[in-house]
């Protein structure tokens, strides 16, 4: 039995169900779930149409490395999105389609972690797959608490001796749950640390297309590499998904791009362990990465939700403002976050996720998720506004 299994924590949504188990919400109020970051947008017509047209391809096996057309569409998208030269991304060497970033983020640790006393560094709070990947690869998780001023991991929290043991660092920008986005200067510091200590950077950029200011798309790790003249993307991998960008979390389609040596090793690993994308999914993904209209329209709807919800909550909860990116609010709570979430559900039938379900206590006892909740503005506007009114009434009634 893998020893790491006994170290895994219950998943946040399992913990949320346990939190709810002892109480019942009012039957007079319909349930509103703002706890799970699952887009509620209708799937883009370009995707559903292509899936229907290509469904006959289910009779064929697909190659793990993906079709040439899909890899080329991904390479073109990366060049457009991050203003890279057309030749910067070679679809044959820099790109690997994957069945969603969840499995890829987990599998990359199994691919690159070696023997010895390895560490895997990650933000705190964090997407729980990072920790599971570290533990099940035999590594020690090292938690980088997000800095209150930036919402990004504080790189000064790890001493030099620990950095020397780090073999893989997960960075999430735009960040779940804080909504912060790293700038090029932050990426430069990461690259310098990687050069000094030799660890691989796995940049989870699945929220890269859900940003607030249409004129300021967040930069990414490959763009930072290009700005530094690192055309080989050495020790750098980025992970992207259609789940958030195109509102198709059930499609399970994404990609990994970057260092060709790492891509080659990852392809070898996934040839044995991974699941190749079905051909009809690859065709739909090719269409999705080639279209920007549906993404721009979705961003406008998210922007409207944030503007209106924040206007209703900013005077009753601390730190409520439209984030740089993602579809999350990360406000402070006037009481313990788990108690807040439980009572809100019990009284208003609104589900939000306690911040401490996404974080771990640091060595000094400080838990950067404690006293906050994550609010996912994924339902339609009217539902988000109804939820905001219920949250507002709840806070005003008690605090």
Please report, for each region that a protein language model flagged, where it lies by residue:
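Generic structural signal for small/hydrophobic residues in well-ordered secondary structure
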Residues: 16, 34, 51, 74, ...
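Conserved core of the PLP fold type I
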Residues: 59-192, 209-210, 214-230
């Amino acid at each position: 039995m893998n020893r790491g299994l006994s170290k895994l924590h219950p998943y946040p949504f399992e913990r949320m169900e346990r939190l709810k188990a002892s109480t019942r919400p009012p039957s007079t109020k319909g349930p509103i779930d703002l706890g799970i970051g699952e887009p509620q947008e209708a799937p883009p017509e370009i995707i559903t149409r292509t899936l229907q047209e290509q469904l006959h391809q289910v009779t064929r096996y697909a190659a793990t490395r993906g079709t040439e057309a899909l890899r080329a569409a991904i390479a073109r998208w990366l060049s457009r999105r991050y203003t890279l030269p057309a030749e910067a991304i070679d679809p044959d060497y820099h790109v690997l389609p994957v069945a969603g970033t969840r499995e890829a983020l987990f599998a990359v640790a199994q691919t690159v972690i070696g023997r010895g006393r390895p560490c895997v560094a990650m933000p705190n709070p964090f997407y729980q797959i990072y920790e599971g990947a570290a533990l099940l690869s035999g590594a020690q998780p090292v938690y980088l608490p997000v800095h209150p001023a930036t919402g990004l991991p504080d790189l000064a929290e790890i001493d030099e001796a620990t950095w020397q043991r780090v073999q893989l660092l997960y960075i999430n920008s735009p960040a779940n749950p804080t909504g912060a986005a790293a700038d090029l200067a932050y990426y430069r510091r990461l690259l310098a640390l990687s050069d000094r200590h030799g660890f691989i950077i796995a940049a989870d950029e699945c929220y890269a297309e859900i940003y607030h200011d249409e004129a300021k798309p967040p930069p990414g790790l490959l763009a930072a590499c290009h700005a530094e003249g690192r055309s080989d993307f050495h020790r750098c991998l980025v992970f992207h998904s259609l789940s958030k960008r195109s509102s198709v979390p059930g499609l399970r389609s994404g990609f990994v791009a970057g260092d060709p040596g790492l891509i080659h090793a990852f392809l070898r690993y996934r040839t044995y362990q991974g699941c190749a994308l079905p051909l009809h999914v690859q065709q739909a993904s090719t269409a999705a990465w080639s279209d920007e209209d549906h993404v721009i329209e979705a961003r406008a709807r998210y922007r409207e939700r944030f503007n209106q919800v924040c206007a209703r909550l900013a005077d009753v909860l601390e730190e409520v403002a439209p984030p740089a990116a993602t579809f999350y609010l990360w406000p402070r709570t006037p009481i313990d976050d788990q108690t807040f979430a439980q009572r809100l559900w019990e009284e208003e039938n609104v589900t939000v996720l306690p911040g401490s379900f996404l974080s771990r206590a640091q060595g000094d006892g400080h838990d950067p998720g404690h006293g906050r909740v994550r609010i996912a503005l994924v339902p339609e506007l009217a539902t988000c506004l109804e939820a905001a009114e219920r949250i507002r009434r709840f806070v005003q009634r008690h605090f």
